[in-house]
């Protein structure tokens, strides 16, 4: 909820959590908790605090064999006032779709782009997206889709906010 000037009234996050062997069960069976400012989740003597807020857009990719994959990843608010945010998602093809590991790696997808909770378009042809309000009044995305080696299985940690530019420069990822 937001005030008329765009200031958030309260920050909350509905989370599910598990510990011990419960992490191997279905997430629907995990404990639920509404995380709020100054009301941390307490687990095994630790406290998990809500540090900020933003959006995690949901994307679904349908592969040529009809299988689909859905991901929801937190995007980084680049504009703290109107929450224009950036992020990236990486998708591995469904198991069994490509028997050769090299071919499968070449068919990974990466989506990188912007999310605007209240999209506003400007520019000569209306092709520049920004956000004019922090609440989701007219959500929009501007994305680039890449195919190739998204680095999913190279053993290195990756940013959830941007692609490794070396993958595109080397030709491993192509728009």
Specify the residue positions occupied by each region the protein language model found.
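Solvent-exposed, non-transmembrane regions of integral membrane proteins
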Residues: 1-175
């Amino acid at each position: 909820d937001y005030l008329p000037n765009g200031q958030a009234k309260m920050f909350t996050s509905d989370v599910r959590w598990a510990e011990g062997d419960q992490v191997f069960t279905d997430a629907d069976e995990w404990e639920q908790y509404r995380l709020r400012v100054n009301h941390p989740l307490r687990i095994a003597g630790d406290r998990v605090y809500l540090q900020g807020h933003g959006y995690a857009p949901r994307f679904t990719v349908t592969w040529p064999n009809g299988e689909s994959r859905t991901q929801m990843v937190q995007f980084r608010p680049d504009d703290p006032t109107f929450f224009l945010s950036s992020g990236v998602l990486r998708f591995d093809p469904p198991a069994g779709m490509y028997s050769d590991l090299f071919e499968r790696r070449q068919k990974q997808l990466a989506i990188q782009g912007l999310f605007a909770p209240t999209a506003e378009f400007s520019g000569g042809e209306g092709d520049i997206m920004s956000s004019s309000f922090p609440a989701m009044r007219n959500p929009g995305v501007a994305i680039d889709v890449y195919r190739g080696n998204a680095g999913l299985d190279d053993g290195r940690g990756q940013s959830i906010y941007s692609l490794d530019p070396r993958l595109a420069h080397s030709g491993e990822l192509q728009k």
